[in-house]
Swiss-Prot record:
Role summary: Could be involved in the regulation of nitrogen fixation.
Keyword Transferase appears in the UniProt entry: no
Annotated GO biological process: nitrogen fixation; regulation of nitrogen utilization
GO terms of molecular function: ATP binding; enzyme regulator activity
Name listed for the protein in its UniProt record: Nitrogen fixation nifHD region GlnB-like protein 1
Annotated InterPro entries: N-reg_PII (IPR002187), N-reg_PII-like_a/b (IPR011322), N-reg_PII/ATP_PRibTrfase_C (IPR015867), N-reg_PII_CS (IPR017918)
Domain of life: Archaea
Keyword Nucleotide-binding: no
Family named by the database record: Belongs to the P(II) protein family.
Length: 105
């Protein structure tokens, strides 16, 4: 099992979620946040924005689903500009459903 953590532009979240749902991946956790990447913020006129709004999507998948889900996120989130985001893949050693006690995702 893997945890896909995608940090994306908030205005692309609906496109990403629609893409994931249409492909059979309806489960996710969404966290609104702020941050910046390598670009170090954004200057508009005389105003410098040190931190920009971002959304973190957490999606737990089986190992054989990682490439498909990452591809869906990349194709839905990309604008071709700085600030499109980053995707991290982390191993999940165990997962439990609180209500039932079942293991796995």
């Amino acid at each position: 099992m893997k945890m896909i953590k995608a940090i994306v532009r908030p205005d692309k979240v609906d496109d990403i979620v629609d893409s994931l749902e249409n492909a059979g991946y309806p489960a996710f956790t969404k966290i609104n946040s702020v941050g910046r990447g390598k670009q170090g913020g954004l200057k508009v006129g005389e105003i410098f924005y040190d931190e920009l709004p971002k959304t973190i999507l957490l999606i737990a998948v089986n190992d054989d689903e990682v490439d498909e889900v990452v591809g869906l996120i990349k194709s839905s989130a990309s604008t071709g500009n700085f600030g499109d985001g980053k995707i991290f893949i982390q191993p999940i050693t165990e997962a439990y459903t609180i209500r039932t006690g079942e293991t796995g995702i």
